[in-house]
Amino acid sequence: MSQDYYQILGVSKTASSAELKKAYHKLAKQYHPDNAAAGDTNAEKKFKEINAAYDVLKDEQKRAAYDRFGHDAFQNQQSRRGAGGGTSSFHPDINDIFGDFFSDFMGGSRRSRPTSSKVRGSDLKYDLTINLEEAFHGIEKNISFSSEVQCDTCHGNGSEKGETITTCDACSGVGVTRIQQGFFTIEQTCHKCQGNGQMIKNPCKKCHGMGRYHKQRNLLVNIPAGVENGTRIRHTGEGEAGIRGGNSGDLYVDISIKPHDIYKVDGANLHCKLPISFVNAALGGEVEVPIIEGGKVNLTIPAGTQNGDQLRLRSKGMSKMRSTIRGDMLTHIHVEVPKNLSKRQRELLEEFKKESMSEKENDSSFFNKMKSLWS
């Protein structure tokens, strides 16, 4: 007995819709071809089984019919189809089986499956690394990647120039053929046109009838000002070209921002370490601070500033996408104590030390902290 759909999803037959959905998403993520190792055919097979199982069990009517007739009944239909000897490529779609079941026994009308030889191209992802200044100002970047592009010889239709594309006479352009199996009417992909519904007598030599071919591409992409690390930018229609004139997929550019030597980013705010002399910390003053847009601004240091204090420069942080508002820059004060003193400097500090020791100052003052370090 082959594994039924409940076993494939790892749930009981009484599982709720929410439990089915949770199990499906977990398994689909695990066995998705993008996450599987290259050449892992077992993962691809498992992924198809998971999708087929969930497609039936998520639908209440299909699930009821499946529970009634069972998985083996479905498998037996396949066995009888190949019982005449030789090989068979018969792989009926469970949707077709249940679709015809409800059509024949519940008075519904079976709709013809819409088919087309046109297939949308795949989406592409490109990882782009920029620096913080580029993220602040915005920039245009020329990126290079390879993808399927529309054939410029046949203009995407897959046929040699001047040749016509005809409707498949085996399936009348539907892309599927029907066979009767007892009370089931089963559809299978047309063997003549491979489900395209059309026949190309003389395929284009450049693209071998696919309407596209592989090529190295260059594209100028615009990175807006204020872009954040991890931002994904969509470029509609810049993915892989579709098959036989199908719509192109999209290109997704994922942004990574390099770490900066001076600034650390926190949303739209910037943080930086600002070294100042102990004289400026004690007496106050002004120091020049570099800003992200280039140049410097003056920052006022209040008298008595302590090591580790934080001073804010408003609207000197990062720009925000699609906004005129900017973040702030927060400077973290680091008081530097001189290591090499001149004779005169030492004399002045010794004099200051004597005067300080004769006074009763608050233990948390800057100068008492300095005395405790020097004692």
Swiss-Prot record:
GO terms for biological process: chaperone cofactor-dependent protein refolding; DNA replication; protein refolding; response to heat. Coiled coil: none annotated. This is Chaperone protein DnaJ. Zn(2+) 1 binds at residues 151, 154, 204, 207. InterPro entries: DnaJ (IPR012724), DnaJ_C (IPR002939), DnaJ_domain (IPR001623), DnaJ_domain_CS (IPR018253), HSP40/DnaJ_pept-bd (IPR008971), HSP_DnaJ_Cys-rich_dom (IPR001305), HSP_DnaJ_Cys-rich_dom_sf (IPR036410), J_dom_sf (IPR036869). Zn(2+) 2 binds at residues 168, 171, 190, 193. Pfam families: DnaJ, DnaJ_C, DnaJ_CXXCXGXG. HAMAP family: DnaJ. One of its GO terms (cellular component) is cytoplasm. The J domain is necessary and sufficient to stimulate DnaK ATPase activity. Zinc center 1 plays an important role in the autonomous, DnaK-independent chaperone activity of DnaJ. Zinc center 2 is essential for interaction with DnaK and for DnaJ activity. The gene is dnaJ. SMART domains: DnaJ (SM00271). CXXCXGXG motif repeats lie at residues 151-158, 168-175, 190-197, 204-211. Signal peptide: none annotated. GO terms for molecular function: ATP binding; heat shock protein binding; unfolded protein binding; zinc ion binding. It comes from Rickettsia canadensis (strain McKiel). Its cofactor is Zn(2+). Disulfide bonds: none annotated. Belongs to the DnaJ family. Binds 2 Zn(2+) ions per monomer. Its main location: cytoplasm. It comes from the Bacteria. A zinc finger (CR-type) spans 138-216. Participates actively in the response to hyperosmotic and heat shock by preventing the aggregation of stress-denatured proteins and by disaggregating proteins, also in an autonomous, DnaK-independent fashion. Unfolded proteins bind initially to DnaJ; upon interaction with the DnaJ-bound protein, DnaK hydrolyzes its bound ATP, resulting in the formation of a stable complex. GrpE releases ADP from DnaK; ATP binding to DnaK triggers the release of the substrate protein, thus completing the reaction cycle. The lineage of its organism: Bacteria, Pseudomonadati, Pseudomonadota, Alphaproteobacteria, Rickettsiales. Keywords: Chaperone, Cytoplasm, DNA replication, Metal-binding, Repeat, Stress response, Zinc, Zinc-finger. It is found in: Cytoplasm. Residues 4-70 form the J domain. Homodimer.
